[in-house]
Amino acid sequence: MNAVTKITPHADYKIADISLADWGRKELDIAEHEMPGLMSIRRKHAQTTPLKDVRITGSLHMTIQTAVLIETLKDIGANVRWASCNIFSTQDHAAAAIAATGTPVFAWKGETLEEYWDCTLDALTFTLPDGTLTGPELVVDDGGDVTLLIHKGYELENGSTWVDEPASSHEESVIKALLKRVAVERPGYWARVVKDWKGVSEETTTGVHRLYQIAEAGKLLIPAINVNDSVTKSKFDNLYGCRESLADGLKRAMDVMLAGKVAVVCGYGDVGKGSAASLRAYGARVVVTEIDPICALQASMEGFEVNTIESTLGRADIYVTTTGNKDIITVEHLQAMKDQAIVCNIGHFDNEIQVDALKALKDVQKINIKPQVDKYVFPNGNAIFLLADGRLVNLGCATGHPSFVMSNSFANQTLAQIDLWEKRDTYEKKVYILPKHLDEEVARLHLEKIGVKLTTLTKDQADYLGVDVAGPYKPDHYRY
């Protein structure tokens, strides 16, 4: 482990370097000015502290922007423990700034998978005054890892044999080993965690997909709020965030000229739309791949070529996966690519690209160029560059989305946490979406910062539309 661990009555953290705290604090101050939604919520609720003494575990990229979210949750009363949701996404100066305030944080850039899952367990382990180990009352999740760990741990205590089944990946084997260890070291721990757990708010598409799968199987243990599908998250973070941060990641990793290159974007959902726009803005010739005829038609109407991955092999210079699905780029695709092709992912997990299969190929030489940039040379002499080991390129090779767009997402997260706690006795064990009036509130909080002035409906106009003058203005089924 290359992290610094400190556990005392006044500090509890595992980070890279606490001396980076001053730098982190300076960037936090800058970010706060770019995050009007979070800061407004902080001011509004600082006196009433709606999350007073609520134990919250966060599993979300430990960036400067996330640090502003953490301090917002703390300022409205929460007792917070945090880990990153990706082995490469932590900004070490952000983690140091949070650790320096006394908030337990367990994250550093470049964790191993074993370290990552240990950090996740650390983040969800709270100690009661009598010394009993317990868990969070609320969870902020990104990708569903905390939710997965608690559910699998609880199932193990109730007779599940999943941990003894063959693992489908190295990461799954790490999770199973951790659960076996906890079963020995902390008997009955997951039952105590579930007893107090009141809800989770989920940040990203992949995590939401996991939640719906668990709910459909009748195994969801708590109410969950799908933050990802709030309009002010999916249509802003996923779209406009990727539009800026994808090119940033590619440029920092490879210093590559994008103009004139053939770039393949796999998937044309919100993330794919932002990614395709990012590459086209720099002059790349973009090819989109899609399974969905509606998304394919959208891409075509925007002027993109829509074709298969196979049709691009040997001619494309850059590949970006955005789908949230697995095996999008296979090892056979990688071997058939143009020499020196750049391959990366901006979907949540690394299984969009068959990285494990690539590493298992015989006679393939791996050359590390710099952190998160690896060159794989095939026996025929051709090579590809794999960025961030197939994980999120914008966070692994750059610093992720800009602060302003993350203020939208994190304002939603904060409101979701408040909503889950205030309605903890009425919410059922199913997946919810934040109501439209809160979605509109989040948008409204960001308008002044960019000089937007809204038109106001007259009473007659509002009556004609069948809405309130103050909103909400659209029905839930409206597609923005």
From Swiss-Prot:
Residues noted as binding NAD(+) in the record, renumbered to the chain: 204-206, 238, 267-272, 290, 325, 346-348, 394
Q: Does the keyword NAD apply?
A: yes
Task: Supply the enzyme class, top level.
Answer: hydrolase
Q: What InterPro entries does its record include? A: Adenosylhomocyst_ase-like_sf, Adenosylhomocysteinase-like, Ado_hCys_hydrolase_NAD-bd, NAD(P)-bd_dom_sf, S-Ado-L-homoCys_hydrolase_CS
Q: Which residues bind substrate?
A: T63, D142, E203, K233, D237
> Signal peptide: which range, if any?
none
**What pathway is it annotated to?**
Amino-acid biosynthesis; L-homocysteine biosynthesis; L-homocysteine from S-adenosyl-L-homocysteine: step 1/1
Location relative to the cell: Cytoplasm
Q: What is its EC number?
A: 3.13.2.1
Key words of the record: Cytoplasm, Hydrolase, NAD, One-carbon metabolism
Co-factor binding comment: Binds 1 NAD(+) per subunit.
- Enumerate the SMART domains for this protein: AdoHcyase, AdoHcyase_NAD
Cellular-component GO terms for this entry: cytosol
A GO MF annotation of the entry reads:
adenosylhomocysteinase activity
Family, per the entry? Belongs to the adenosylhomocysteinase family.
General function of this protein: May play a key role in the regulation of the intracellular concentration of adenosylhomocysteine.
Any idea what this protein is called? Adenosylhomocysteinase
Provide the species name.
Answer: Xanthomonas oryzae pv. oryzae (strain PXO99A)
